[in-house]
């Protein structure tokens, strides 16, 4: 197998792994709202108490207007007995009003915070079930923005808007009922301005929705840039990227600022316009009410009460106008959240949960990425159980793609992969991944203790003795015991308090503790100093015993002892054999090996 051949282009059009993106078709606005309201069903009792509370609050608005009538008439009639009661009535009225406000505000907040909790947990759990291709297609900052920013905006649509609609909506209904009861002819004039108000709200709604989507997109960009700078702070500092990153962040933040100011302008025009219409209607009502034909039929108290009730309409109407902006912003965020929740999850077609021996066979396997890049083409390789096979080749040769296929992070475009004779797609994902341990160049550690990082996830049931033995086999025990609290020491975010070699040894200890029949070492010793590499190589020798091992390496001196070495180029194996055999071929491997010593 010493000759390379060109991939047959007719075979690369097979099933292509498609990376899902967040940018899917947005559902209709009404559908989004109904879906949001469905989250409120379990809290119907709290919403009922909210309605009762705000209904009490609305009733007190009527009594405030009515009280003005009684006070005015009592003064005109010089009725001292009634006047002595008014201070007590005022105190009781505002006490009842306070009880109603408390019920409404408290239970609205209860629904709101629980909704944030439920949505956030649902989105986070959804992220755990999405395929790797989703993360390749969407920046981390955009994803985290959905979890943090969009969820809060959705809550505003579902609960804060509900609070305003109930509180001020009930107040408007109560006051309009009182006005109709007091003088229905005058009150009908107020309804004349209703059509233009509704038209203004409709126009503003479309504007708010469009701008809210723009704000969300720019917030995702802001979060993405921030994540990049935080994660790559060393590169930013070492290469003097502060000015560039500052300008990039400034441009994105200004986009967000402009979108936000457009919302302010829209709201600043819409709200006064609605208020002006209401004021015009009120002016007509007051003018007519002062006509002799009208005012002669009512007392001064009734007149004051009617005008006061009409004046009290202004604030709730303004609030109902303002809530439209909040509602549209929340609906835009809801569309974004639901688009993510509707993303197809990682497909698990498996039905088998076997205990694997570690035999791997790849038969005419091809992998084509969505951008038509051919990663593997008619790839064939048989690996015996317990055998160590090293994969070498230049960047882009297909080494990492092959590993992703074995863990089903990606799926084949064509061909077949079998483990112990079983098609890989017939094995349950949980069972498959439980029997594959990986040690990567980019070590992933979590902001918790050393113990929890080694006994991570499904390994949490392991005993302290088992964890300690794994650490000893990984040559990590000694430096762990030198830490302030030993295995219970916190290692900081991403384990940055540890050296590269120490972090790698913890990763190896985790793989040892997993005790899986198949081991994948992906550039596990690159970018390390000689002492760290010495200990890690000894640890790797321990972990590779009696396991099927795939080793991806750039430095060929680390894989000379492999049972076989596969040289990849253009997504195919161009040479296969032991180190000695490949050196005798004087082909690709020999040339790469010679370059290692130049």
Curated annotation (Swiss-Prot):
A GO cellular-component term linked to this record: plasma membrane
Protein name per its UniProtKB record: ATP-dependent lipid A-core flippase
Keyword terms: ATP-binding, Cell inner membrane, Cell membrane, Lipid transport, Membrane, Nucleotide-binding, Translocase, Transmembrane, Transmembrane helix, Transport
Subcellular location: Cell inner membrane
InterPro entries (UniProt xref): AAA+_ATPase, ABC1_TM_dom, ABC1_TM_sf, ABC_transporter-like_ATP-bd, ABC_transporter-like_CS, ABC_transpr_lipidA, P-loop_NTPase, Type_1_exporter
CDD domains found in the cross-reference section: ABC_6TM_MsbA_like (cd18552)
Chain intervals with Polar residues compositional bias: 1-15
Membrane topology: Multi-pass membrane protein
Originating organism: Psychrobacter cryohalolentis (strain ATCC BAA-1226 / DSM 17306 / VKM B-2378 / K5)
């Amino acid at each position: 197998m010493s000759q390379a051949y060109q991939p047959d282009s007719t075979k690369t059009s097979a099933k292509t792994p498609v990376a899902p993106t967040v940018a899917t078709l947005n559902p209709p606005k009404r559908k989004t709202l109904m879906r949001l309201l469905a989250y409120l069903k379990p809290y119907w009792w709290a919403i009922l108490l909210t309605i009762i509370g705000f209904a009490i609050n609305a009733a007190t608005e009527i009594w405030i207007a009515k009280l003005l009538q009684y006070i005015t008439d009592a003064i005109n009639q010089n009725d001292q007995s009634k006047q002595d009661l008014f201070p007590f009535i005022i105190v009781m009225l505002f006490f009842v009003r306070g009880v109603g406000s408390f019920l409404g505000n408290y239970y609205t907040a209860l629904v709101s915070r629980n909704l944030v909790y439920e949505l956030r947990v649902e989105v986070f759990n959804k992220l755990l079930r999405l395929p790797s291709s989703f993360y390749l297609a969407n920046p981390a900052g955009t994803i985290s923005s959905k979890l943090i920013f969009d969820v809060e905006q959705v809550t505003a649509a579902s609960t804060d808007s509900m609070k305003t609609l109930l509180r001020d909506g009930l107040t408007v209904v109560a006051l309009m009922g009182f006005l109709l009861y007091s003088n229905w002819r005058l009150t009908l004039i107020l309804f004349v301005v209703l059509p233009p108000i509704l038209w203004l709200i409709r126009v503003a709604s479309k504007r708010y929705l469009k701008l809210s989507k723009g704000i969300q997109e720019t917030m995702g960009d802001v979060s993405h840039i921030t994540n990049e700078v935080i994660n790559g702070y060393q590169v930013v500092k070492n290469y003097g990227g502060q000015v560039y990153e500052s300008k990039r962040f400034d441009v994105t933040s200004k986009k967000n600022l402009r979108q936000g100011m457009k919302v302010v302008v829209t709201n600043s025009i819409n709200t006064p316009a609605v208020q002006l219409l209401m004021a015009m209607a009120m002016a007509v009502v007051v003018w007519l009410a002062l006509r002799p034909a009208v005012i002669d039929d009512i007392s001064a108290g009734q007149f004051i009460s009617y005008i006061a009730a009409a004046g009290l309409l202004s604030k709730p109407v303004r609030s109902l106008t303002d809530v439209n902006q909040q509602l549209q912003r929340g609906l835009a965020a809801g569309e974004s959240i639901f688009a993510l929740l509707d993303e197809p999850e990682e497909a698990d077609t498996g039905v088998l949960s076997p205990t694997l021996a570690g035999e791997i066979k790849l038969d005419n396997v091809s992998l084509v990425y969505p951008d038509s890049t051919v990663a593997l083409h008619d790839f064939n390789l048989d690996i015996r159980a317990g055998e160590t096979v090293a994969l070498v080749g230049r960047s882009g040769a297909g080494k990492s793609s092959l590993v992703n296929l074995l863990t089903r992070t990606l799926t084949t475009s064509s061909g077949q992969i079998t483990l112990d004779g079983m098609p890989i797609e017939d094995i349950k994902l949980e069972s498959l991944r439980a029997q594959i341990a990986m040690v990567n160049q980019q070590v992933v550690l979590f902001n918790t203790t050393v113990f929890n990082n080694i006994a991570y996830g499904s390994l949490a049931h392991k005993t302290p003795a088992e964890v300690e033995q794994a650490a000893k086999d990984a040559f990590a025990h000694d430096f762990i015991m030198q830490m302030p609290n030993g295995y219970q020491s916190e290692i900081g975010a991403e384990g940055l308090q540890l050296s590269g070699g120490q972090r790698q040894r913890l990763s190896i200890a985790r793989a040892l503790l997993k005790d899986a029949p198949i081991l994948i070492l992906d550039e596990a010793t690159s970018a390390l100093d000689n002492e760290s590499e010495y200990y890690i190589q000894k640890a790797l020798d321990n972990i590779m015993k009696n396991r099927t091992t795939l080793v991806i390496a750039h430095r060929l001196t680390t894989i000379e002892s492999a049972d076989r070495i596969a040289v990849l180029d253009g997504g195919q194996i161009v040479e296969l054999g032991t180190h000695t055999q490949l050196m005798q071929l004087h082909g690709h491997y020999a040339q790469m090996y010679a370059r290692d010593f130049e």
